[in-house]
């Protein structure tokens, strides 16, 4: 019986990491927007379950408090929920009136859940049609680089999102790998050899590297 119940849950099609991010047009608190208009910038597209909810409110305040950190990294923040634009506007105004925080980025209206379904933000296992708490990081070439999902009860760690962007931009720029718990300024991993001749060459030339073994070498960037 339990197996049958699981099998009856509809499958959610998610966009794939490394593939082009699905384009969309939408109305927002900043007017009409189109994802492809942000080509050349990184995008953090994040969904929230609903306006006027406590955890989401703390997240939007937290995003705003470090908004300049995203701007410095050439990142555009875009929020989304299945609420209406009037609801978004009322919520944003309420946040400003009660906390003095003015939300500086657009929030998408997705009443028909078109974008939420396109990005797999609606969980078929939930009884609510609210969008799950998700994060999609899209690079300046409109390639989807990362997907994060959070339970409805737990707010996002905004500093971790910034750390991930730093890591992605660093590995792109220097063609390296980021180790566990990496932060800017720490050593990065040199990609390991892919062939035996490359392995032999690595063993001969480790100048500038700190190596544990041939497949794990670090360097500063």
Swiss-Prot record:
Active site annotation, chain numbering: 56 (cysteine sulfenic acid (-soh) intermediate)
Residues at which substrate binds: 133
Subcellular locations according to the entry: Cytoplasm
Single GO molecular function: thioredoxin peroxidase activity
Pfam families assigned: 1-cysPrx_C (PF10417), AhpC-TSA (PF00578)
Job description of the protein: Thiol-specific peroxidase that catalyzes the reduction of hydrogen peroxide and organic hydroperoxides to water and alcohols, respectively. Plays a role in cell protection against oxidative stress by detoxifying peroxides.
Subunit structure: Homodecamer. Pentamer of dimers that assemble into a ring structure.
Note in the entry: The active site is a conserved redox-active cysteine residue, the peroxidatic cysteine (C(P)), which makes the nucleophilic attack on the peroxide substrate. The peroxide oxidizes the C(P)-SH to cysteine sulfenic acid (C(P)-SOH), which then reacts with another cysteine residue, the resolving cysteine (C(R)), to form a disulfide bridge. The disulfide is subsequently reduced by an appropriate electron donor to complete the catalytic cycle.
Homology family: Belongs to the peroxiredoxin family. Prx6 subfamily.
Protein name: Peroxiredoxin 2
């Amino acid at each position: 019986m339990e197996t049958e119940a699981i099998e009856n849950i509809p499958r959610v099609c998610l966009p794939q990491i490394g593939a082009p991010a699905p384009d969309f047009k939408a109305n927002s608190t900043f007017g009409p927007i189109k994802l492809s208009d942000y080509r050349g910038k990184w995008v953090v597209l994040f969904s929230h379950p609903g306006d006027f909810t406590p955890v989401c409110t703390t997240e939007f305040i937290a995003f705003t408090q470090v908004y300049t950190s995203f701007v410095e990294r050439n990142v555009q923040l875009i929020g989304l929920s299945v609420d209406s634009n009037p609801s978004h506007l009322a919520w944003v105004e309420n946040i400003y009136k009660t906390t003095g925080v003015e939300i500086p980025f657009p929030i998408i209206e997705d009443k028909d859940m078109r974008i939420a379904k396109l990005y797999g933000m609606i969980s078929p296992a939930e009884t609510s049609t609210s969008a799950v708490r998700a994060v999609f990081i899209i690079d300046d070439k409109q390639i989807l680089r990362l997907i994060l999902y959070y339970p409805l009860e737990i707010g996002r760690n905004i500093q971790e999102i910034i750390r991930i962007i730093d890591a992605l931009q660093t590995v792109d720029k220097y063609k390296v790998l980021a180790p566990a718990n990496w932060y800017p300024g720490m050593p990065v991993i040199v990609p390991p050899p892919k062939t035996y001749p490359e392995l032999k060459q690595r063993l001969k030339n480790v100048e500038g590297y700190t190596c544990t073994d041939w497949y794990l070498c670090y360097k500063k960037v």
